[in-house]
């Protein structure tokens, strides 16, 4: 059954808002983007820089390589390369034009120790404020809730740009996600004219599979993706599409976490989650000779189910997004194979009832292994669901209704794991 026009338009707009290109891990890129905006109002590179951010930004920017920098890591590097070589007009591809000269200059500024870091006292999990001083002038650029949501640009006492925001809530910055539910997502995927969403979805296929291919042919980190295939995959009659999917998506994350210069298409503000909801679906479609139209409809399911789950959790938390992305991806594969609404719900429930609670301890090499592990459990959950085996309401956090289960996970992640998030950051920052 088709959705009403208003909800249909919202679903298309949500896909447009969430499936966007990003070059590099989105938290250090958000720092670089904020810094690039600061340079625009300062007219040059500040001599002194104060980088203030929420704990989750510190967590996710600490260990991941910033793209196009030759291996630079950390918040200072992210801010400096954004100030020196960033192009704020390119959004999450802010570092696309960085050159070797920019990187050399960033190292020189790092050597001057001109940057300071400060943990912000803020209820927002995604919050960045960068203050710079140059020739007696002071500039401020501030971003909150979404990775390109600049809310303040100020030079001395002059407000150059400002928009209202709430520290506690991201409501209003994007299309209201509360319209999402599993049944309507499936109805939308069944009925939306493919031409209406094809440019959005097929760009995700093109970008994310290119990164996966790069991860398989290039040495990145500990080569999780390559090694999954090396240790587990066999040719001929023993070929496993499940292992292939896990290897290809892990390889994509290997590349992304270790400085790959190709952009990916995100989901819920995360490149890794964008990879996790798309690459395995493409692999299953390829191996099962699924048509492009059906692939597009399956990727609609995967993307929107992931966004739906993340709505209650929030963009950044101590709850690893590989779990929700894996559940969404496996549910889309259930849909691909003709599974019913009950079987799609069962896939999600089985996954959330099994691997919920995997910690997010920041963006780094092991994200690839977490994605593969979550996907492995999710694909087993898919197999169980296809045979009619589902966890029942009352089994731990599982409720008797899919929407209640998803809402409960949101409460666990956003409220229950708040203290966990603080302790994880403390452990990460302690020698």
Swiss-Prot record:
Source domain of life: Bacteria
Record GO terms (molecular function): L-cysteine desulfhydrase activity
Any one GO biological process: L-cysteine catabolic process to pyruvate
Family classification: Belongs to the UPF0597 family.
Annotated HAMAP family: UPF0597
Protein name: UPF0597 protein TDE_2144
Top-level taxonomy: Bacteria, Pseudomonadati, Spirochaetota, Spirochaetia, Spirochaetales
């Amino acid at each position: 059954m088709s959705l009403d026009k208003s909800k249909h338009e919202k679903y298309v707009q949500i896909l447009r808002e969430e499936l966007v290109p990003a070059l590099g891990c989105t938290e250090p890129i958000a720092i670089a983007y904020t810094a690039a905006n600061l340079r625009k109002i300062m007219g040059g590179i500040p001599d002194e820089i104060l980088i203030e951010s929420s704990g989750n930004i510190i967590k996710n920017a600490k260990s991941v390589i910033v793209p196009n920098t030759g291996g630079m890591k950390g918040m200072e590097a992210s801010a400096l390369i954004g100030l020196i070589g960033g192009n704020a007009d390119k959004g999450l591809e802010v570092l696309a034009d960085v050159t070797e000269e920019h990187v050399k200059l960033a190292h020189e500024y790092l050597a001057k120790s001109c940057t300071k870091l400060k943990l912000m006292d803020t209820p927002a999990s995604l919050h960045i404020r960068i203050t710079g001083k140059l020739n007696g002038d002071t500039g401020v650029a501030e971003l909150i809730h979404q990775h390109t949501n600049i809310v303040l640009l100020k030079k001395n006492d002059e407000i150059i740009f400002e928009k209202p925001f709430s520290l506690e809530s991201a409501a209003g910055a994007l299309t209201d996600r509360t319209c999402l539910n599993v049944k309507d997502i499936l109805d939308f995927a069944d009925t939306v004219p493919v031409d209406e969403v094809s440019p959005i979805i097929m760009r995700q296929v093109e970008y994310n599979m290119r990164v996966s291919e790069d991860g398989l042919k290039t040495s990145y980190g500990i080569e999780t993706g390559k090694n999954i295939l090396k240790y587990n995959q066999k040719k001929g009659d023993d070929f496993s599409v499940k292992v292939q999917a896990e290897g290809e998506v892990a390889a994509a994350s290997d590349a992304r976490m270790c400085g790959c210069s190709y952009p990916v298409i995100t989901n819920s503000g995360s490149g890794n989650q964008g990879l996790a909801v798309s690459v395995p679906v493409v692999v299953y479609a390829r191996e099962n000779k699924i048509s492009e139209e059906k692939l597009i409809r399956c990727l609609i399911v995967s993307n929107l189910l992931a966004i739906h789950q993340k709505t209650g959790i929030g963009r950044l938390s101590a709850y690893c997004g590989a779990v929700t992305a894996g559940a969404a991806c496996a549910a889309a594969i259930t849909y691909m194979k003709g599974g019913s609404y009950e079987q799609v719900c069962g896939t999600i429930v089985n996954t959330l009832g099994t691997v919920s609670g995997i910690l997010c301890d920041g963006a780094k090499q092991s994200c690839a292994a977490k994605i593969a592990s979550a996907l492995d459990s999710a694909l087993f959950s898919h197999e169980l669901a296809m045979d009619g085996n589902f966890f029942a309401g009352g089994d731990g956090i599982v409720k008797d209704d899919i929407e209640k289960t998803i809402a409960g996970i949101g409460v666990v992640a956003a409220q229950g794991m708040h203290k966990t998030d603080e302790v994880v950051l403390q452990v990460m920052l302690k020698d």
